[in-house]
Amino acid sequence: MIDPACGTGGFLLSSYEHMKGQSHEIAKQKFLKNNTFFGADNTSLVVTMASMNLYLHDIGVDNSPIVCQDSLIDKSDRMFDVILANPPFGTRPQGSVDVSSNRPEFEKTSDNQVNFLQHIMSIVKTGGRVGIVLPDSVLTDTGATARVRRKLLDEYNLHTILKLPTGIFYAQGVKTNVLFFEKGTPTKEIWTYDYRTGIKHTLVQNPLKRSNLDEFVKLYNESTRKETYSKDNPNGRWRKYPIDEINKDESLNLSFKWIAEEDDDDKTIGEYLTEMETISADLASSVAKLKDLLEGVYDD
């Protein structure tokens, strides 16, 4: 498995902790530590920290599995069975190598998350599994982003979306999701768990805990999935969207909403501030995209 934007290696270590108890055979433990986990980051200091982090857990002792590289311009033909990633938010840093010139098969966009999604789609093996953290914009934007979504639905099985509260992975106010998909068969239906509407977490007073997602994990792992949403229970958080219904929307908007929002009169000042931060984050993202477009015009 690989994390192509691994940072200090948190996803890799969590995966190791999850897997290490599955077998006590010495050969399998050795393979797990030396031949299972790989990561990449484009900052040398971060790569060093990730390597040390794994080394302290006896992973990659002889040869670090973390490389310093820009994953978005990596043309190696290595494929992976499992990919976990939380790509950096926003646009590429100024001075970075142009992605489209190195990856002409990609839909041309300056959106970092969309490019990482395209990269991950290109390196997962047939039958391989992906879990990737992405902002709402990747589920809603038109143009190149919508075309990437079209390819994702046509060539991969995007079976599950977990909607998270704002501020969990990115800055406060940015709405995030975890997309789960497999390569090899087209999407027939998308199961969505809304752990956002009416849910509020803060880093200090009410941090997100593993137990908060117990219901999602249980529903996700059921051999026969059943919706908790129904006409009699319109606020059920687990809902299925068939591909025929999704295709009726020409924009392929995948940010599904069905749970009623609370009335404004019930909101606290802190919640209003969070909404303002959300609007500010969306505005900053739009301004960044506009700057990219204007730079392209001036370059021409």
Set out the residue ranges of the language-model regions:
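A conserved structural/catalytic subdomain of Rossmann-like adenosyl-cofactor enzymes
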Residues: 74-300
